[in-house]
Amino acid sequence: MHIPSRQTEKQEAFLYNYDMIGNQMVNAGALHQMLKPYKAHLITGHTHYNLNVVFDENLMEHNTAAVCGTWWKADICLDGTPRGYGIYEVNDNDVKWYYKSSGYPKEHQFRSYPVGASKEHPSDIIANVWNWDKLWKVEWLEDGQLMGNMTRYTGLDPYASVVCSDREKMVYTW
């Protein structure tokens, strides 16, 4: 599908909101109900960022970032994910996936930032792990030594903030 069914786990009734109408389906509840008896993965796009939503044990949505980055204006997407595409490997009921950044090897799965790089969390080391989902565990290692688990938060990627705030570069002529 192109437009995401929902961007949160919470199953709320559709509410007309002009700013959000392009990011959700009017009939997402009916679609999710129809898929309830099956183990299903929805693959969507449209938003130019990665977002995985686990609705329940049988239904997950993968909103995959764009191969065009920020509408061909930058090599990254709005969430800091490099432009690229999703790879999905299906073997019977077993589904595995990862995000493949264009021009990088498969192993290129995150960007890290030192203390002070984030305005939102200036005293923290930040890792933007593209295609993350809530079933993953993200750990901080330094020189091969486990330093601890990282805490998830939703915020701005420092590099994407710089790139996307350049108004002259991001002007669209369409």
What are these regions (language model features)?
Residues 40, 127-129, 152:
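A composition-driven signal for long, intrinsically disordered, charge-rich low-complexity tracts
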Residues 146-171:
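Solvent-exposed serine/threonine-rich low-complexity stretches and specific carbohydrate-binding patches
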Residues 59-143, 173:
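Binuclear metal-dependent phosphoesterase catalytic core
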Residues 6, 104-105, 147:
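Structural signature of outer-membrane beta-barrel domains
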Residues 10, 108, 149-151:
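Outer-membrane beta-barrel proteins
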Residues 1-62, 84, 123:
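His/acidic metal-ligating clusters that form di-metal
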Residues 18-21, 25-29, 33, 51, ...:
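Intrinsically disordered, low-complexity regions enriched in small/polar residues
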